[in-house]
């Protein structure tokens, strides 16, 4: 069985084909980073228009890569939310239209479930149950996962997501969009301990996060110190260490409260090398395991949507003829599979 996956929730157009026996057959991705760089962030209207231009050509490229034709596709999965409404509508409209034309089921997929299941694409996928850290530009959540669709929200950011804080702080440091990866690169040249940033909300019980204050602390530190390259690198290092430590402390609490031995890390920020190293070290000390997708599957991509679509299709999930998207869509609302 083969599922075509379409991802257009923000500023990446991702198309992939997943086979339940052979695995990933094709993976095509187009990033709009250069398009939005001059604006310092994603412009929703520009994102939607670029998805219109790229989605169908990428589908054609994916079919060619896999050596397949439309008649070989058994279902079409598309991201139905959460995300930018215009961008979502492009993928949903194309996906629903192709499914109708090809006479196959259409499968609406939750974007964050796609991220959560992305590590399942690897050779050593995690078994249930596990704690999932979903950490990206739009979300920072800790979730108890006991099965497909069996998700319990343990904690989340009450303001900025971790990835958003990375990007905003990078902008304060004069780095171009997207700033998160560039800040991490700068931090690798920084001196540990020169600046010490707070670890927000770790001095009290609970599993919620808050990163807006950390961003403000960074802004004040930048204003109060020199603008030389080493100082900026030291500030970047202090900021990254604070975010990583905060995430690690909360993950440890979540594992302690659930009693689980497995931690899954997903979303764009999960590609951060410092975060991966710290969580791997923590899980080794706890005699547990940490799982994450390869870097190209941490950011938005069609492969995770094709895989999640396969899982949901086997559970009987399909869409009607209408095109419906949900820019806001709590993960806990998904049914168990």
Curated annotation (Swiss-Prot):
It catalyses: L-threonylcarbamoyladenylate + adenosine(37) in tRNA = N(6)-L-threonylcarbamoyladenosine(37) in tRNA + AMP + H(+). Required for the formation of a threonylcarbamoyl group on adenosine at position 37 (t(6)A37) in tRNAs that read codons beginning with adenine. Is involved in the transfer of the threonylcarbamoyl moiety of threonylcarbamoyl-AMP (TC-AMP) to the N6 group of A37, together with TsaE and TsaB. TsaD likely plays a direct catalytic role in this reaction. It comes from Salmonella paratyphi A (strain AKU_12601). Keywords: Acyltransferase, Cytoplasm, Iron, Metal-binding, Transferase, tRNA processing. Its cofactor is Fe(2+). Pfam families: TsaD (PF00814). Disulfide bonds: none annotated. GO terms for cellular component: cytoplasm. It is found in: Cytoplasm. GO terms for biological process: tRNA threonylcarbamoyladenosine modification. Binds 1 Fe(2+) ion per subunit. The gene is tsaD. GO terms for molecular function: iron ion binding; N(6)-L-threonylcarbamoyladenine synthase activity. The keyword Nuclease does not apply. This is tRNA N6-adenosine threonylcarbamoyltransferase. Its EC number is 2.3.1.234. Its main location: cytoplasm. Belongs to the KAE1 / TsaD family. Fe cation binds at residues 111, 115, 300.
